[in-house]
């Protein structure tokens, strides 16, 4: 299933120009999750992978495109299969090699920082405090924005439901003709308001990435005087830290979007029920409209409750990652399993590069037939 998913993803992007539908990040996640689950060698984990939301999402997309998939040439399919297999095989081979490289890097970095161990620990602690000060307002602002825009969504939809109730009372004789436009508009309003909600909330993740870059750069500068002989190794570790922290920001963004989509999925069926009741008697329709209003209240409140802790949870995760860096660089760190984050970062960089190559090829040669498209696999390590 893994190879089929990756091959079809890359085929879809290469041939149909569907970069907007299937991203490099999605493909990298499929490959990385598969590698991680097989590395754990747990039957339950592999079963979970097969049922994961991402796999279902990609499979659904491919089913929609199955007619196009069947038209791909054997030559292109072979190239893409080769690339997908190479990704996974290189992950497996590079894992142990990179693990040893990171172990040696940390060993040399700790030795270089050892004469200044107390100062280094204090500087990292100061950085954690600064990070906490930077992130605190964002967590509170996210909570405020969630409450504000969720309330706006509820008010918009409740007002629409109330207009339907008023119309119902005034047009008892011709309910279907009077209320059908309102029922159709209700679904459109749900879609519109949920999209606006996502539009207001998801940019926070991008703003947090900027703060992460600022914080990591501040940390690099503060530690530079103590790492003159091992600066390159320190920079590499800080790159890994920034990658992990930004991954948390992406996960926050995905959670916000997923919660908003879940809210939509819970609201739309109720609107459809109301539309279906237009053929019923007035009493049944009044009951449905009353249930609609209470359902709106419950679902919006549940959304607010679910979203409430996200900001604080995100902040704690970032602070914990900086604390883990402090422990890694300390004199008593011992062996640390730290190579996987670097391996994942390298994988995502290479998949992004592969997608960029496809996009450039497509832009430069839009009229070239599909069989003439040449793809060059991008190795995981240069």
Curated annotation (Swiss-Prot):
Pfam families: Apolipoprotein
InterPro entries noted in UniProt: ApoA_E, Apolipoprotein_A1/A4/E
Gene Ontology molecular-function annotations: cholesterol transfer activity; phosphatidylcholine-sterol O-acyltransferase activator activity; phospholipid binding
Region (13 X 22 AA approximate tandem repeats) location: 33-330
Signal peptide: 1-20
Source species, domain of life: Eukaryota
Subcellular location: Secreted
Keywords, ordered alphabetically: Chylomicron, HDL, Lipid transport, Phosphoprotein, Repeat, Secreted, Signal, Transport
Coiled coil: none
This protein's GO CC annotations: chylomicron; extracellular vesicle; high-density lipoprotein particle; low-density lipoprotein particle; very-low-density lipoprotein particle
Sequence repeat spans: 33-54, 60-81, 82-103, 115-136, 137-158, 159-180, 181-202, 203-224, 225-246, 247-268, 269-286, 287-308, 309-330
GO biological process: acylglycerol homeostasis; cholesterol efflux; cholesterol metabolic process; lipoprotein metabolic process; phospholipid efflux
PTM annotation, UniProt: Phosphorylation sites are present in the extracellular medium.
Role: May have a role in chylomicrons and VLDL secretion and catabolism. Required for efficient activation of lipoprotein lipase by ApoC-II; potent activator of LCAT. Apoa-IV is a major component of HDL and chylomicrons.
Record note on quaternary structure: Homodimer.
Comment, domains: Nine of the thirteen 22-amino acid tandem repeats (each 22-mer is actually a tandem array of two, A and B, related 11-mers) occurring in this sequence are predicted to be highly alpha-helical, and many of these helices are amphipathic. They may therefore serve as lipid-binding domains with lecithin:cholesterol acyltransferase (LCAT) activating abilities.
Family according to the record: Belongs to the apolipoprotein A1/A4/E family.
Protein name: Apolipoprotein A-IV
Naturally occurring in which organism (per UniProt): Mirounga angustirostris (Northern elephant seal)
Name of the gene encoding the protein in the UniProt record: APOA4
